[in-house]
Amino acid sequence: MNENPAIGENATDTNTAKPEEEEESWGSFLIFCLKLVLAVLIFRTFIASFFTIPSESMLPGLRTGDYLIAAKWPYGYNENSLPLGLPGPSERIFANLPERGDVVIFKHPVDRTDYVKRAIGLPGDTIAMQDGQLILNGEPVKREEAGYAYIPMSANTACRSDGGTVVDNACRYRQFRETLPSGKSYMTLDFGNMGARPLRDATGNLMVDKGGRPVLIDADNTEPFVVPAGKVFVMGDNRDNSLDSRFPPVSGQGVGVIDQELLVGRAGIVLWSTDGSAEWLLPWTWFTAARWDRIGDTM
């Protein structure tokens, strides 16, 4: 006979307490996860978000494989600012236009994919190109030869034969320093006068006019264009390898002038950069593929 029944009662209490403690632990963990998700959503919505560079249109400053952090607050917020395609207001809150020279992230007006270009023209500005020279409000933008840019060739970076020269496993391009009236300056690449080029649609087929003739655009020589209200004229720094506001908006192709509502953020810092040779199943290649010298570069 049990002379001390309290012992049996305590044992029963201890056994029932364990499942309760486990339930509390799981509950605390779920609450922590929800708080973490909420914190990430708030950060990516209102403060900053991350973007990758998929093409060479912003050479020499940005390279394929760069991972950027972009500030969300400079241009305000709307549905295009929200991560993961979450619903939001269609009209921008705390709206601001970019400054000329800002590197902007925006949604393509047709397919809504993320693009990155440099803001060149604001509402009311007149933009034109003459033999590769940018004309802003009737005045040539200051443009100086700046030697050559040497872009290392890698798994995600080739060398264009129509504009570059292979030198010691790098591609050499002529570069120029362009300086806007505000004093903002940056490097651009120029392959020379490329002449008129045919436009293609989203499937890669040639676009034709009503007479069946290919539609041609000479991006080095364009007629003066006045940027409408609420729009931004953008260009890639790699002037002869960029489908930008000089081209009509076509999915996967040109972007036309960008509606202010399509702005996502202002590019800031390169957080990571890879030459494209890494393999997910070989973790050590994540480090051998890294371009360590690019990490921390600012726009």
Predicted regions and their residues:
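Hydrophobic alpha-helical membrane-embedded or membrane-associated segments
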Residues: F32, L36-F43
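Soluble "head" domains of membrane/secretory-pathway proteins
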Residues: N2-G27, I42, I47, F51-T52, ...
